[in-house]
């Protein structure tokens, strides 16, 4: 077998099965089952996932979230976007699958996903639910990947990997401030809606987040330290969501009715934490 063919096969295997980065010396990766699922059953595992996020209930108009958009079949978690009738504010049904567990913290998180081919997002991210009784309080969001399979604006979320960190800060007077920090972009090839890709994130510590694509390191994100020296240290929920953006033209009813374009597929999601090798 030629070297080129062998390398190609190796890349295919990595893309299909995922690959954790080498652990630090003296440590090993251990699977975190609370945030892992192969989606091999016939229904969503409700011990692990909500079919409609209780933390972000409605979504961003014109799309909202409906549990009926979510299914597990053919070995995939599927979120099928569709026309929603009878609602003046929302006319598109998307989906927001959220973890039951709320303690995702430092570790490695990855999902094998194929985006829809419409102008809605296909995403994999994490966020904490704030305690609004605190003063001040923060919401932290870790966007591992946000892609859009059909672009109608000039922004390329189809072939460029977009990852970000956001801190939503509310002071004791109710004044809100947002600080965001991302990384350099990386190419998604083939485009996000044409093939499955493994999107990974090593949340190293409160200041360091490394992004991976198909098992390869791409860039590092350093969350803003505007409010605290250790900004990203709060446990989070995991989300797999399809939504509309206020900067992107929504899909047409005809596009939403096309079953070859309207669905985002998650083959699996896997998560790992570090433990000493002697444990």
Curated annotation (Swiss-Prot):
It is found in: Periplasm. Coiled coil: none annotated. It holds the Pfam family Glyco_hydro_16. It catalyses: Hydrolysis of beta-D-galactopyranose-(1->4)-alpha-L-galactopyranose-6-sulfate linkages in porphyran. One of its GO terms (cellular component) is periplasmic space. Its main location: periplasm. The keyword Transcription regulation does not apply. Cleaves the sulfated polysaccharide porphyran at the (1->4) linkages between beta-D-galactopyranose and alpha-L-galactopyranose-6-sulfate, forming mostly the disaccharide alpha-L-galactopyranose-6-sulfate-(1->3)-beta-D-galactose. This is Beta-porphyranase E. It comes from Zobellia galactanivorans (strain DSM 12802 / CCUG 47099 / CIP 106680 / NCIMB 13871 / Dsij).
């Amino acid at each position: 077998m030629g070297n080129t063919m062998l390398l190609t096969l190796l890349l295919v295997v990595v893309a299909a099965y995922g690959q954790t980065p080498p652990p630090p010396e003296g440590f090993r990766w251990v699977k975190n089952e609370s945030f892992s699922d192969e989606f091999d059953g016939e229904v969503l595992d409700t011990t692990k996932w909500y079919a409609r996020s209780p933390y972000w209930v409605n979504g961003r108009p014109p799309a909202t979230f409906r549990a009926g958009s979510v299914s597990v079949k053919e070995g995939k978690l599927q979120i099928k976007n569709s026309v929603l009738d009878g609602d003046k504010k929302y006319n598109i049904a998307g989906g927001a699958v959220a973890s039951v567990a709320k303690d995702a913290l430092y570790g490695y998180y990855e999902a094998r996903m194929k985006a829809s081919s419409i102008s809605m997002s296909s995403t994999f991210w994490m966020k904490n639910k704030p305690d609004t009784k605190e003063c001040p309080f923060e919401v932290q969001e870790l966007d591992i990947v946000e892609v859009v399979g059909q672009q109608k604006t000039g922004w390329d979320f189809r072939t460029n990997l977009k990852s970000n960190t956001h801190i939503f800060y509310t002071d004791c007077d109710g004044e809100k401030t947002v600080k965001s920090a991302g990384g350099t972009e990386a190419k998604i090839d083939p485009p996000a809606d044409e093939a499955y890709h493994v999107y990974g994130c090593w949340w190293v510590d409160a200041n360091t987040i490394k992004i991976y694509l198909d098992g390869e390191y791409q860039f590092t994100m350093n969350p803003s330290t505007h409010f605290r020296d250790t900004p990203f240290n709060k446990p989070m929920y995991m989300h797999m969501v399809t939504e509309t953006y206020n900067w992107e033209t929504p899909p047409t009813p005809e596009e939403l009715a096309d079953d070859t374009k309207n669905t985002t597929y998650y083959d699996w999601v896997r998560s790992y934490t570090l433990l000493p090798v002697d444990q």
